[in-house]
Amino acid sequence: MVDLSVKIGGLTLKNPILPGSGTFSAELARVVDVNRLGALVAKTVSRESRIGNPTPRVAELEAGMINSIGLPTKGIDYFLNTQIPEYSQFTAPLVASITATTLDDFGAMARDVSIPEVSAIEINISCPTRAPDGGNFAMHEDQTSAVVERVCSSTDKPVWVKLSPNAGDIVSIAKAAEAAGGDALTISNTILGLKINTETFRPAIGNKFGGISGPGIKPIIMRMVHQCSQAVDIPIIGCGGICKVEDVVEYMLAGASAVMLGYIVFRNPSALTGIIDELEVWCDKRGIARVADLTGAMIDDPIVETYEAATAPIGQGHVSVHSTAAE
């Protein structure tokens, strides 16, 4: 039997498959056995209620979707009094996702959600659709550091930091989050983009710009996961374009310890548990006893002489053959 468990920021999860924040609600349990998931990540909540961005909020792309939801929420009181009792019926660990506009409010929010029902806190400092230009705390090292320090000093829960792919240097942001006390990184939020309706000449999204998600961004986010994994020692949760088990494996080989599914959950919620089953089968067929051993296991040969050597499956004669052209 394959051991699917992974460790993330002080938590041991039964498997590395999580729903991304904004894709999970208690209603999902009607179609998916959510108790099988590694953890449940709640939709981001803020102090006050928010109605979100103007419509239309979502448009389809060739390889994904673009959205500008704007983090609508009914506020912290509703989360604590209504949603927490709903989530408490499930056995998977609950991760509360919080956002705020000031350091004091981030600290207060962290204290508010530091309750027994919550196993970890994800701080969403990277939503690209709240400000018109996509700006957020995660675009800057000093602001990231300040928020993470304030949250970590306000709670004894593990703190996950959700980063932005729109930052100029995400590796520096990741290092700042780690130095400030973050226990894990979520890489990443959506990529800011634009889609235009060619019949109306207007933006397809009411807020003009939106966050792009889906298979089209996967190679970009995987590159960021790999680069950050080489620079920090805390676990990374990969998030972006994961639709099948091979995507999970790729992210883990690149350096992720777990993954979050977003885009695919809108199209096929049962993919959450289906991928768990497929991951166990995938590992078993290849003699991999622990899924955690996949993390960072990409073979990074700088020069490979033959196509056969480069593409040989693990356990079937893979060798590192370096060029001798200069000899």
State the predicted function of each range.
Residues 1-94, 100-101, 275, 324-327:
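N-terminal capping/small domains of soluble enzymes
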Residues 77-84, 145-149, 222-229, 273-276, ...:
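Predominant activation on well-ordered alpha-helical scaffold segments within soluble catalytic domains
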